[in-house]
Each structure stands twice: as C-alpha cells, then as structure tokens.
Design a protein with these regions (language model features):
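Core catalytic lobe of class I
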Residues: 1-179
C-alpha cells in the first residue's frame, strides 16, 4: 500500500513510529537554485527525525550535489558511510558552460547508525583460488609474503552508476526508477 502525504516533511515524519523504517530514500532540496521550493531543510531537525524513524541497521540515502553534499556529509559525519555517483545522460548547468564544466552527475549519500546492509547486484560466480603477493619491508631488507584466498565472485558494483535521465517528467528533479 502506498500512502502519499503532502506537507512539511519535518512535521509529517513525527507521525512515523520510532525505529520502523528499513530505508529512507529521499531527494531533499539542495539550495543551489533560485526556485522557491529549493530551500535547504535545516539539518539538525532533519537528522533528529531520520535517526528516530530508521531501524538500527537501516539506511538513509539522500541525493545531493555540491556544495550541498559537503555540508550534508559534515552534518552527520558519524553515520556517513559512502557515496554513489549517478552519471546522468544529460547535463544540468548549460547556462554556466563558459565558466565551469557541465554537470552530468549527482551524488547519493549513504548514512547508517550501524553497518549498512549491502547486497551487491550483478555478481558473477567464479570460485577460484587467487594468489596475491605483497612486498613486505622489515629490518632485514624486506621480502615477499604470498597469500591465497578463494575468490567467489567478480563483477562487483563500482561507485559510478550509469542510468539515463528521464524525459517528460512530472517534476524537474525527478529521478529514474531503475536508479
């Protein structure tokens, strides 16, 4: 069941029970345009509510773009885990093309109070023994220490995600569903 609500997110989140959400995925305003709706949500009350509603091992994933992204990560550095980079198929800042590079990416920031669940997609099973040599320097001139391990899979996801930008969207910042 989908229950859509319209209103102030900080007020609406107060209706959500403590520790009841597995994952929050949201695209907050970045405060990088002159649009009326593009006002940054105050970080302190936002984090207070997000931490309250999320399960201990739950994930909080927020879209962002600089300089908003840096401020967002710093605002909750203790829970910050890593970023994904969404490489879009269309650039966004054509009006600034003569003074800065065209922006063709957005960031997804992953936060969690504990070890965030990570389920890599698209793995290929290999099950082979891999040897790894490592140069070791010590007081006797160094040497090579070799180790073996069982590599079970390959094709692990990388930090850059490539998904086509949506066209004819309902909202100007709408993201593609497959992303």
């Amino acid at each position: 069941m989908i229950d859509l609500k319209h209103g102030d997110c900080l007020e609406l989140m107060k209706e959500i029970p403590d520790g009841s959400v597995d994952m929050v995925l949201t695209d907050p305003p970045y405060g990088t345009t002159a649009c009326k709706w593009d006002s940054v949500i105050p970080f302190e009350p936002m984090w207070e509510q997000l931490k309250r509603i999320t399960k201990p091992n739950g994930a909080i994933v927020l879209f962002g773009s600089e300089p908003f992204s840096s401020a967002l990560r710093i605002s909750n550095i203790k829970q910050y885990k890593y970023d994904w980079v969404w490489e879009k198929s269309r650039f966004a800042n054509q009006m600034l093309a003569k003074i800065q590079p065209l922006k063709i990416h957005e960031l997804l920031h992953v936060f969690s109070s504990w070890k965030v669940q990570y389920n890599p997609q698209g793995l290929i099973e290999v099950n082979k023994v891999t040897k790894q040599g490592k140069k070791v320097t010590d007081n006797n001139g160094g040497g090579v220490r070799k180790s073996e391990y069982m590599q079970t899979h390959t094709n692990y996801p990388r930090s850059i995600l490539r998904f086509k930008s949506e066209s004819n969207t309902v909202h100007s910042t709408q993201k593609p569903v497959p992303l």
